[in-house]
């Protein structure tokens, strides 16, 4: 059967249920960190700051190798052109054995009561998976403050804290 591959596509929408353009391949599992038992790019989340767009996605299989990758683009460019997106060569968030958080992924972004960006994601608190990993109940929701680096890019770190 070979590897099962999951890619991310982009298209302009005519409505909530209808495409206005043909779908375009945005990213496919290119790097080793995206190619665990399954070759996966899935679960995109979008974050915007100024003119910069950051699309995070989950990669690899759902065990300890599950992680978050990121693409970035400038708003105002043709987002349907894959050449306008730059893919990070390394995951922006991955398992942290010191913290006991494994396989972070499938994230989204929300704002807190002060308008600050917060990443919501799931991860495991154990490294061993019993049974089918997709149906194993050991995935929990986590919140992570998004801190912005001096280069204007988001920094995802388990030690992130907001300044009060």
Segments the model singles out, each with a brief description of its role:
Residues 1-164:
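Carbohydrate-active catalytic/glycan-binding domains of CAZyme proteins
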């Amino acid at each position: 059967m070979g590897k099962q591959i999951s890619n991310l596509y982009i298209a302009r929408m005519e409505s909530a249920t209808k495409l206005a353009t043909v779908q375009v391949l945005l990213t496919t599992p290119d790097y080793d960190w995206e190619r665990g038992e399954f070759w996966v790019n899935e679960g995109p989340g979008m974050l915007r700051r100024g003119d910069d767009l950051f699309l995070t996605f989950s990669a690899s299989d759902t065990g300890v190798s599950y992680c978050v990758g990121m693409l970035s683009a400038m708003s105002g460019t043709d987002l349907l052109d894959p050449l306008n997106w730059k893919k990070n060569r390394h995951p922006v968030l991955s398992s942290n054995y010191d913290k006991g958080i494994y396989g972070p992924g499938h994230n989204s972004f929300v704002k807190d009561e002060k308008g600050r960006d917060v990443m919501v994601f799931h991860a495991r608190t154990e490294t061993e998976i019993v049974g089918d990993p997709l149906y194993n109940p050991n995935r929990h929701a986590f919140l992570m403050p998004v801190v912005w680096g001096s280069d204007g890019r988001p920094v995802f770190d388990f030690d992130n804290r907001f300044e009060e």
